[in-house]
Amino acid sequence: MTYKDKVAAITKQFRQTVENKYNIIEMKLFGSFARGDYSKTSDIDLMVRLSKVDRNIEEDLFNIAYDLELEYDCVIDVIVLPQNFDNDIMIYQNVQKEGIAI
């Protein structure tokens, strides 16, 4: 399995797990994988917008990512945003420019 295939499997599994529990507004892969300049040591950057976000939901998403990190021996960084937020946030603008919907 190539690293690109591995990332595809991880993002698919992450999305399926999250959408079985929560109402996803938007989910994107961004960073080096979205730009195509990744290496085998690159982390996997994911942005998730949900209709509702609280501390417990955020912690659950981090735990889902952690389980995948252990399973696939990788690093996953997750940004969790509520449906209504200030979309002037710089990181969100970057995700919108370079992100790939998953």
Residue ranges of model-derived segments:
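Glycine-rich beta-strand-to-loop/alpha-helix junction loops that act as flexible
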Residues: 30-32
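Short beta-strand->loop micro-motif that forms the acidic, two-metal-ion catalytic signature
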Residues: 45-48
